[in-house]
Amino acid sequence: MAQPVHSLCSAFGLQCCLLFLLASWGAGATTFQEYQKTGELSTSDHIFPLTPGLVYSIPFDHIVLHSGQRPPELPKSTEIHEQKRHCNTTRHSKPTDKPTGNSKTIDHKSSTDNHEAPPTSEENSSNQGKDPMIRNQRSVDPADSTTTHKESAGKKHITPAPKSKINCRKSTTGKSTVTRKSDKTGRPLEKSMSTLDKTSTSSHKTTTSFHNSGNSQTKQKSTSFPEKITAASKTTYKTTGTPEESEKTEDSRTTVASDKLLTKTTKNIQETISANELTQSLAEPTEHGGRTANENNTPSPAEPTENRERTANENKKTICTKGKNTPVPEKPTENLGNTTLTTETIKAPVKSTENPEKTAAVTKTIKPSVKVTGDKSLTTTSSHLNKTEVTHQVPTGSFTLITSRTKLSSITSEATGNESHPYLNKDGSQKGIHAGQMGENDSFPAWAIVIVVLVAVILLLVFLGLIFLVSYMMRTRRTLTQNTQYNDAEDEGGPNSYPVYLMEQQNLGMGQIPSPR
């Protein structure tokens, strides 16, 4: 009886061991695949360090088609020609109707590549040398985004189609997005904004030099406010990095001129009128003059109607993604003492839908808690300024999106990096590289599954061992009990159970008992 039970237990134990080995092998294969995916993610993160979502690349070469002026120069870096891209980007593109003056704009762009702002070039190079952006334990200089924008400006005659391939060294990813984990940067958004408020006063005059190249109106009070320009770029990055819009529109996506400005356009044509009404329903503080923004109506290139509708929809999307849209007060000195909340002002002229040849400055600003007098302006630069540090303008018909940014320190770039992390984590259904990360967030990681399987197998084996031990002890005890009962019965009823000496004494008399001699 004991041998069949023992053989059954041994066979069951061998089967459990085989199952455990198979589970461990499968978990190891899954871990290896995830490790390869992680390697691909790190490679793509090194290549595209600033892309929170894939967007249309809208170069700013459209600015000066009819004005005959030079576009503003991108910030120069000492490592522009040293850092090489490791990926070949091939875009499947289809030609659309573009004005014939684009070649002229490219010539203007190439002629102004070596033009620098005298007061700010040394500061920019020193800031770029000392404060590179650190994301995912890598040092990434903003020159990569500058070279990316130059390549996109060179391909200006072709509008990118909804598909793009990026052929890297080891893998091919469909979209050039970057996954970042929010626990590596160590600063939430609120801390980074408050730190920006502290550091913006120290670098109060970073971009104060502007060269007028033909229009002296646009130099009105556009100096000594780099902290507001930086705050404006932060707002633009927050509103345009929404992953929900990147799910809905299959756009070809790439980085733009600055490392913190991304412009998202969609193809929803039906929302144009509502976008115009929503933009006009906000505050229009035109009485500020030079206090609020330099609003310039300049002739823009004759774009197709689709571009106009895209930009209108873009303005609506920008408004919808921002949770708090409040108009700018008439005096900038009000409500600046105790708050770090962001306010956005999106201004559109009254005749923006009637005259498509005019453009209006759509301005976004963040008010940090810095004492600002009423005479100073919330500066955004227009297309007539020859030099700011970075100016990105998107003229598409009836609207023009003007955003600016200046680099104060590495804290600003870290704050911008922190803003993109929640969007990346929320994007559960985004295709491409985010699938592996969201798969890990939605389910248990492989090592946890392996540990659970190991613990379950060990507990099962211990339980089976206890059952086997109890059954064996019961059988042994039963055998011992039977042997004991048999021995006792034999001692009591056997022929040698009563002593012979006593029997002889009872049967024989005392005289018959032989006495020992």
Curated annotation (Swiss-Prot):
Keywords for this protein: Cell membrane, Cytoplasm, Glycoprotein, Membrane, Signal, Transmembrane, Transmembrane helix
Gene Ontology CC annotation, any one: plasma membrane
Compartment(s) of residence: Cell membrane; Cytoplasm
Membrane spanning residue stretches: 449-469
Chain positions covered by the region annotation Disordered: 67-341
Cytoplasmic face residues: 470-517
Protein name: Mucin-like protein 3
Protein species of origin: Homo sapiens (Human)
Lineage: Eukaryota, Metazoa, Chordata, Craniata, Vertebrata
Name of the gene encoding the protein in the UniProt record: MUCL3
